Amino acid sequence: MASGELACRYAALILSDDGIAITAEKIATIVKAANIKVESYWPALFAKLLEKRNVEDLILSVGSGGGAAPVAAAAPAGGAAAAAAPAVEEKKEEAKEESDDDMGFSLFD
């Protein structure tokens, strides 16, 4: 990760924490005050990204999407999703039945 990108992230967090509107000029001012050299496009890029989004919402939603993404990508559309769900449940039940039969008492199988 580039240090310029990280500096702009921190500057945006500082502005958001103080309740100040996030603009490219303000991000550049904070980065300049920290004596960090940043490419000129980073402050504008972050300002454009964050003008439509709330920083607090982004922070709160960081961990909420991790496990759901693979399931959503694998799920078929429409009525096929309902048909696929029972098939998955049946496979889980079969695995439980097999594991109940073999309790691990035979050491040399």
Curated annotation (Swiss-Prot):
PANTHER family: 60S ACIDIC RIBOSOMAL PROTEIN P1, LARGE RIBOSOMAL SUBUNIT PROTEIN P1. This is Large ribosomal subunit protein P1. GO terms for molecular function: protein kinase activator activity; protein-containing complex binding; ribonucleoprotein complex binding; structural constituent of ribosome. The keyword Cytoplasm does not apply. Plays an important role in the elongation step of protein synthesis. One of its GO terms (biological process) is translational elongation. Pfam families: Ribosomal_60s. GO terms for cellular component: cytosolic large ribosomal subunit.
